[in-house]
């Protein structure tokens, strides 16, 4: 007879609780597979995330421009970051100007894709127009052309504008005339579904020109007659308006690309033609 001390104790397997995360769950699944990963953002959320990010980036650069204007005052202490000229959006090759050019180039590329995929030349026409605006600003074509006109024609000062400013206006007018003809042809040949896109881009580009040309020349005319703070405010208004409408252009083109396809409406049948 075996004594109690010599008996083998039966070992009962111990199952860890599912909350411990070390053993199988009651339904036999792997506990690591029971933890659901967060779902991806739906397409609408992704679009709004990208748009909000771009708008916040615009606001941050405009805020940097505003800080620069205060830090750049003669009696203000120099700021180690924002006193640099690149923060002034009124200067060429500034941070704001570079961001604006990037956005216009992105809009141009997307318009070319729309032209190819939808077989609508009106998108290609708008790509040409926006590219021309970008190249003109990037290579300073209107400034160089204005200087050539001043040298060749001896342009006078008119209505508070310097001869150079008048020459730039003439170059802009010539560019607008040529591009306007191209736009009219593109609009006349545009499919019906692209009509709204045409007028939306026309409005946005018109506002961009209003700030880039109109407010710019107004600044030149009134600056000698207003306090420095008013001149600074006009410069900031021009910079803000240009950047905002460049951003709206790229957002509008992106919306044209992602919107659902509109169903074609069939012509209503005349009651007299209904089969009986």
PLM features per residue range, with description:
Residues 100-111, 173-182, 240-257:
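Hydrophobic cores of alpha-helical transmembrane segments in multi-pass inner/ER membrane proteins
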Residues 135-182:
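Membrane-proximal helix-loop-helix units in multi-pass membrane proteins
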Residues 84-99, 154-170, 229-243:
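Short aromatic-rich membrane-water interface segments that cap or initiate transmembrane helices
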Residues 113-123, 187-199:
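Membrane-interface helix-boundary motifs at transmembrane edges
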Residues 57, 126-133, 192-220:
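Alpha-helical transmembrane segments of multi-pass integral membrane proteins
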Residues 142-152, 217-238:
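Interfacial helix-loop-helix junctions of multi-pass membrane proteins
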Residues 211-221, 225, 237-274:
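C-terminal transmembrane-bundle signature of multipass membrane proteins
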Residues 57-78:
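Alpha-helical transmembrane segments of multi-pass membrane proteins
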């Amino acid at each position: 007879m075996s004594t109690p001390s010599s008996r083998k104790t039966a070992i009962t397997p111990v199952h860890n609780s599912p909350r411990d995360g070390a053993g199988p769950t009651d339904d036999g699944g792997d506990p690591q597979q029971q933890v659901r990963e967060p779902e991806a953002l739906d397409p609408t959320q992704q679009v709004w995330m990208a748009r909000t990010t771009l708008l916040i980036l615009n606001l941050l650069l405009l805020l940097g421009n505003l800080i620069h204007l205060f830090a750049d005052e003669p009696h203000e202490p120099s700021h180690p970051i924002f006193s640099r000229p690149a923060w002034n959006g009124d200067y060429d090759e500034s941070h704001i100007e570079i961001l604006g050019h990037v956005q216009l180039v992105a809009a141009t590329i997307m318009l070319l894709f729309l032209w190819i995929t939808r077989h609508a030349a009106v998108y290609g026409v708008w790509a040409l127009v926006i590219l021309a605006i970008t190249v003109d600003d990037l290579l300073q074509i209107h400034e160089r052309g204005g200087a050539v006109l001043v040298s060749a024609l001896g342009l006078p000062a008119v209505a508070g504008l310097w001869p150079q400013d008048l020459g730039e206006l003439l170059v802009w007018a010539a560019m607008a005339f040529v591009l306007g003809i191209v736009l009219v042809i593109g609009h006349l040949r545009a499919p019906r579904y692209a009509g709204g896109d045409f007028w939306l881009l026309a409005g946005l580009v018109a506002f961009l020109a209003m700030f880039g040309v109109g407010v710019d020349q107004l600044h030149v005319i009134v600056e000698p007659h207003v306090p420095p703070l008013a001149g600074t405010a006009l410069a900031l208004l021009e910079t803000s308006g240009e950047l905002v409408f460049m951003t709206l252009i790229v957002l509008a083109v992106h919306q044209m690309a992602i919107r659902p396809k509109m169903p074609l409406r069939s012509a209503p049948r005349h009651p007299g033609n209904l089969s009986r």
